[in-house]
Amino acid sequence: MKWVLLVALVLFPCTAGHASTKLKASWRNPTYTGQRFKRILVIGMSKNLETRADFEVALAGKITRRGTTGIAGTDILLRPTAGPLDLTYIREQIRAFKIDAVVVSRLVKVETKTTYFPGQPYVLPYYNTFFGYYGTVFPVVYSPDYLMKDKTVRVETNVYSVKPPDGELVWTGTSDTFNPGSAHKVIRQLVNLIVKELEKQEILPESAE
């Protein structure tokens, strides 16, 4: 999209295991002087309405607790059932709610890696009696083969100033979530990561918690 916004999320496919979210790469606009934004709109780009709303509300709430007003897109944007929002409508809402920055996150890709682990031989202890040896047949047996599947969900998050005419990219980051479990847990981890990084980049004030 030509026009700039801030933070989007897509439904995370769920797999078993413990989710871990890490920042893969980030860039900050060198011309950004650290001016504080007052009202930040959070937009999650997902076809799943519930996941999108959960993400927007969670991030907006955490931004607000940092002393900056966070506004969830789900609270001010009436989205069509299919297709993107009209850019003129977005501009009107941004002006109406006096928003000066937007956070947008989008799903980049989902990768699933399957690793095959062949059976591994191990040596049995030596038995010097018939009963100890009987049933082992050979002094070497094999552990069973098995497969391990790892899923990685990559999300891009951009922060834009929306001052006229079209705004400016302030910060962009790419995060990887490994073996995501429930969407709720992934959202919580992603939100925490985003806020922590925005504090580090002096886009948000540091937490007093």
Q: Residue locations for each model-derived region?
A:
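Sec-dependent N-terminal signal peptides
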Residues: 4-12
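C-terminal/domain-edge helix-coil "capping" segments
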Residues: 18-38, 47, 135-209
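N-terminal segment of the mature soluble domain
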Residues: 39-41, 45-114
